[in-house]
Amino acid sequence: MTKDLQKRTLFAVLALAIFLPVLFAGGLLLQIGIGLLAMLGVHELLHMKGLKTMTIEGALTLFATFALTIPLENYLTFLPVDGNVVAYSVLITIMLGTTVFSKNYTIEDAAFPIAVSFYVGLGFNALLDARVAGFDKVLLALFIVWATDSAAYLTGMNFGKHKLAPRVSPNKSIEGFVGGILGAVLITVVFMLVDSTVALPYGIYRMSLFAAFFSVAGQFGDLIESAMKRHFGVKDSGKFIPGHGGVLDRFDSMLIVFPMMHLFGLF
């Protein structure tokens, strides 16, 4: 077993031991924890671009991310529309409003923080929506992501000969990409044999096709983050997890997979 694979395995074990009990419990603790993870992910992206979070604009970006992530509709019940939409829109409007009164903060400056708050906040919000729908649905998504990552890594390491996206991620191969898809389909079939109700109203054959799509989406999410890191000239998104980089290095695929599963009506 290579050192990199040992690190991946160790992280997976620790993540399962810490994250899964909180995920299983759900509720406010999970919502706050995921909201803080989302804020940390946006902090990493702002830091990549050289933007400071200890500013009015930076704070607004972090609060907007938190507002989009947690299910505010459960707490702002007096509003006639979704609480997330209202809170996020208000904070983004304030952020745009600062461009009116500041000579050094333009619409172009505001565009990147707004984009990353939406990208990260929407992904983590979908994770919380999945948990509300059922613990098994979150597990299915996580297993698809982890199976894709592990199968792609092992297949690419042993059989990878053709580069997938050399400009963005030189180490990824087409063989690994295909291996990741097969790994996701296999874990989905096994999961549904154990829990046949997780993907209702879809059966195992259609879910196998969906799993292939989710695997592609997850690997695309990985490439998106790789492209951003290469653009900004950094190796990792952050240093939150020693030896593993930042939050986005671990959650990049999930930020795409969870919204896609929601789009397909799985929760």
Specify the residue positions occupied by each region the protein language model found:
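Membrane-embedded alpha-helical bundles of polytopic integral membrane proteins
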Residues: 1-173, 177-212
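Interfacial loop-to-transmembrane junctions
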Residues: 7, 230-252
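Generic detector of well-ordered alpha-helical packing
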Residues: 9, 45, 150, 223-226, ...
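Hydrophobic alpha-helical transmembrane segments of integral membrane proteins
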Residues: 17-18, 238, 255-256
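Short helical (or helix-break) motifs at transmembrane helix termini and adjacent helical loops
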Residues: 147-157, 218-230
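Hydrophobic transmembrane alpha-helical segments of multi-pass transport and channel proteins
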Residues: 215-220, 247-255
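C-terminal transmembrane helix pair
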Residues: 228-229, 252-261
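Juxtamembrane boundary at the C-terminal end of a transmembrane helix
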Residues: 262-267
